[in-house]
């Protein structure tokens, strides 16, 4: 079916619902970066979180950057997601493996708290004009969902519920995604809507399992929580959107980055290496800059 975003509203337009599937994007990141299953899960969660945030931006070229700076062995992460559904990202320590921990449900789970440690979640919203909006909150527990909910509560003062999860089977990520439920700004003071949101979300015992059982049917996933969604409140075109891992790097951008170097640095590269190879942090694509191109940079 492929990764996607599905949007809906409920309670006569008072509650906004967004579900995202990031299974394929997570697996592509795993292949590109050589991620462990722990870091694949963490990056997949960050993909879901950033896409959920970007989904509400008013312009198609709007982007959200989600960065974690922390003292855990993961060594941080950075994700860039667009309103257009394109996402990319990387973690500081792609090969990280940790022992599983037992959950309250007597099951085993990745130790996200230990992986990320203590630190901060930084969110940048860029509409492509004016100054980007930046906000930083402390990490709650490193599972990304609660960290994102904390950001929404402290930075946007919007009653929200966030669910993010994944399921791994036979050495594959078989489902990865998230769900965001928000009381819309004009309705946020309505205590009945806030109570409705809280009550419906209490019914979710294991989002990862619910996501897997939905078999990629995100609308069905949403309806399990809010069966009375407003089908006609969002146009068919805006309701479902493709999501994919896609990087914005290019050879020209690599050349431009090289041109930022001091001429003495360029001369040093030319003498010692005779060429330069630039590797994109987001997707691991490699760009070779030959000696003639470096000489031209030095001349100019």
Swiss-Prot record:
InterPro entries noted in UniProt: Heat_shock_Hsp33, Heat_shock_Hsp33_C, Heat_shock_Hsp33_N
Chief place where the protein resides: cytoplasm
Disulfide bonds: 247-249, 280-283
GO cellular component: cytoplasm
SUPFAM superfamilies assigned to the protein according to its UniProt record, in alphabetical order: Hsp33 domain, HSP33 redox switch-like
Compartment annotation: Cytoplasm
Transmembrane segments: none
Domain of life: Bacteria
Keyword Chaperone: yes
PANTHER family the UniProt entry points to: 33 KDA CHAPERONIN (PTHR30111:SF1)
Function: Redox regulated molecular chaperone. Protects both thermally unfolding and oxidatively damaged proteins from irreversible aggregation. Plays an important role in the bacterial defense system toward oxidative stress.
HAMAP family per the UniProt record, alphabetical: HslO
Protein name: 33 kDa chaperonin
Gene: hslO
